[in-house]
C-alpha cells in the first residue's frame, strides 16, 4: 500500500503511459501534444481555457505548445470576429488524420491493458478516478480566487 496518494497516482500514470508513450513518440508528438490532439478529435472546436483545463496544461505552456502544433499544421487558432478576447482551437485535416492513424494503435494498447488488468478492473478504476476528480473539482470551486 502506498503511503502517499499523490505518489501512487503519479506511479499509476507512469504505468499507463508505458503502454502509450511509444505510440505517441512514433507519431513525433509529445505527451502534451497527444492530449491536445485527442481532446480536439472529440470536439470540433474548443475554447483555449477549456482546452488547458481538460488537457491539464498550464495556459502559458499551452500557448507555446499550440504555436508549435500550428507551425506543424496540426491545429488552427481562431478568434471570433465578435469577441477578440476569445480563442478557439481546432484540429486541421492533417491533425485529424494523425489522430486516426494513432488511434488504432492506442486502442490496441488499451486491449493489452485490459488483457492484463481486466476490463472490469479498468472500468472500476476509471469510475473511482472520475469520482475522485469530481471531489477535487468541487473543492477547487470552494477556494476563493481566480476560478476561470
Curated annotation (Swiss-Prot):
Tell me the function of this protein.
Answer: Repressor for the homoprotocatechuate catabolic pathway hpc operon.
**SMART domains, per database record:** HTH_MARR
A biological-process GO annotation = negative regulation of DNA-templated transcription
Q: Which residues form the HTH marR-type domain?
A: 2-134
Q: Give the highest taxon in the source lineage.
A: Bacteria
* Short name of one Pfam family: MarR
Name used for this protein in its record: Homoprotocatechuate degradative operon repressor
InterPro entries reported for this sequence: HpaR/FarR (IPR012712), HTH_MarR-typ (IPR000835), MarR/SlyA-like (IPR039422), Tscrpt_reg_MarR-type_CS (IPR023187), WH-like_DNA-bd_sf (IPR036388), WH_DNA-bd_sf (IPR036390)
Entry annotated with the keyword DNA-binding: yes
Q: Which UniProt keywords apply?
A: DNA-binding, Repressor, Transcription, Transcription regulation
Gene Ontology MF terms in the entry: DNA binding; DNA-binding transcription factor activity
* Stored PROSITE patterns: HTH_MARR_1, HTH_MARR_2
Q: Which gene encodes it?
A: hpcR
